[in-house]
Amino acid sequence: MKTYDLFINGQSVPPQTKKYFDSFNPFSGQVWAKIAQATAQDVDDAVQVAHHAFSEGPWSTMTATQRGLLMHKLGDLIARDAKELATIEVQDNGKLFAEMFGQLNYVPQWFYYYGGLADKIEGNVIPLDKKGFFSFTRKEPLGVVAVITPWNSPIMLTAWKIAPALAAGCTVVIKPSEFTSASILHFVKLFEEAGFPPGVVNVITGFGNEAGTALVEHPLTKKITFTGSDSTGKIINQQAAKFLKHVSLELGGKSPNIIFADANLDDAVNGAVSGIFAATGQTCIAGSRLLVQDSIYDELVQKLVTLSKTAKMGDPMSSDTQIGPVTTRPQYEKILSYIDIAKNEGAKLLMGGEVATRPECGNGWFIEPTIFGDVNNKMRIA
């Protein structure tokens, strides 16, 4: 079984307590790896290293052009290893290989773009109406950026956050979800190969109430960027506010599709099905609500259920699979609880609504594609 340590100052480092926690493969439901459980002391080590790299190390003296070239090299390495990284993500979060591989082929573009932008971050000269005064602005890196990412698209969402930070000259400490840390720990090894100095990119793994809190409240982290749940986002915002830190939050959504009578219903149904069941519905922009004009409601529901019943569930590594398992056991149980809530509140179950027991689902965390009708805004699922 694979064991993953922390990544600090360009090296794999065991946690000071030598404690590790289990990482589960959602398709098998079995433990497949052990992940280091960071403490506040481990977090401090990572932040101190990142701060040193920012203020005194080689990174601090690099030109913007040099940073950009390193980022371009990194993009090439990600493209080279996209298949391997995507395979690890599938083991870790159970999403379809086709989706993960597609994301990994897109990620290099993010580093190419921001690598090209690095030497174009410019200030302005501001005209004044007073003689003897000269006014200008310059843009400077903040320092250490704390990057906290979710379990649904680990590498892609991490890249979205760290690429602009690195282009600006910041250093980063990444805290991935405790459910999907392995791919990030593979990913950051590429920074060393690309030529990034030690300490520029660091990873601490563990739980939010320990490692996450220590990272957000550390006096040397100057910006917090987080993608995840509303509830955790509120906690992070409150913690960061005590220190007046810069905060960027990307939180959950409840996205509606609105379908009117003049729409092409076949196209609308295709879009609605892919919008909710892609990624097993585990995205912040999943189209989890349909607002349908009364005159086409019955026809659209029939088409929607008919198409949804054709979805193939199973091994996320198979090219034939259309719906994979739920990524985490807590999320799996939460979805089932909301199905029960919907039934109890009077929503009409149109299909699904139960654990998937198909042979191809094995012991994984699968739930049948589920659709409710006759839902109103007072119901919790809405």
PLM regions with names:
Residues 68, 72-75, 79, 101, ...:
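Short amphipathic alpha-helical segments with heptad-repeat character
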Residues 123-267:
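Rossmann-like NAD(P) dinucleotide-binding subdomain of oxidoreductase/dehydrogenase enzymes
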Residues 32-121:
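Glycine-rich loop-to-alpha-helix module at the N-terminal edge of alpha/beta enzyme cores
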Residues 29, 67, 89, 111, ...:
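Residue-level signal for inorganic ion chemistry
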